[in-house]
Every structure is written in C-alpha cells, then in structure tokens.
Amino acid sequence: MQKYTVKKDEKKIIQIKESGDYLVELNGQGAQAEILGSFLAENSEKININITVIHKAKNTLTNTTLRGVARDKSSIRFFGKIIIEENCGLSNSFLTERVLLLSDKARAETVPELEILTDDVKCSHAASISKIPESQLFYLQSRGISKKQAEDLIIDGFLDLPML
C-alpha cells in the first residue's frame, strides 16, 4: 500500500500511475489534495486501483479523479472510498471514476463509496462506464477526420486530466 499524508495547510498533487492500493490521509486543518489517475489498458492487461481518502481534520479538501480506457480484452477496476471522520466539519471531498470501453470484450467496474461521520460537509461522487458516443465520432468525421484519428483525439482528450 502506498500512503500519502497531507499536513496542516499543506497542498499536494498526488499522481496515481499504476495498479495498487493507495491511502491518502488529511491530518491537519487546511490540508488539500488533488489526486489524479489516468490509465490505458490494452490486450489482456488488468488495472486495479483501490484508493481510500480519510479526512481526519476540519476544513480539508480533496478532489479525486480516476479515468481509464479499456481496449481488447483488458479490464479496469476503480474502488474509491472517502471517509470524513467525526468532528471534521467544513470538509469537501469529490470522487470521480470514469471508464471508456473500446471493445465488447473489455470490462470495467467502478465502485465509489462515501462514509460521512459528521455534519456540515460537502461530499459527492460520480461514476460512469461508456463507449465513445457515436455523435462525437460523427462530428469529427464530418470535419474530414478519419474514424481512427477521431477515436484517438477523443481518447487523448479523455485521458488528459486537468489540474485544478
């Protein structure tokens, strides 16, 4: 397990680059973390990300964004959990897990979980598993871009995570 600790008034950007278990603890007031992971799985590759974010102090902030693209017979599993402990009000935490499937044999699973043990917090999650929308491909192809180039552009844009 890889563990990250964010202390009082500290700001961290944490990049998740490989399968594994991750723990992020916000241990002091004003601690902030931006957690980003973007993955391309091909052939029979399996990507498994288990991440737990624990708010252990008041007035903390996290934004966790995981994105994946699964091709061929690959699989992607995102398990994200946010815990806001007792007496940790005024904390904000957001978890997003999104996967694009590029093959009928590719697989994905997203499991966001929230455990809120106090009041006066903002906490939310979003999860989606989808294929590339035909309307996006059609739009790019109507501008003279080949289907393969259009798919590549959409995938590149999907995996390119902005830092907030």
Provide a role label for each language-model segment.
Residues 1-138, 142-145, 159-160:
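Conserved beta-strand/loop scaffold segments within soluble protein domains that form the structured core
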Residues 155-164:
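Short arginine-rich
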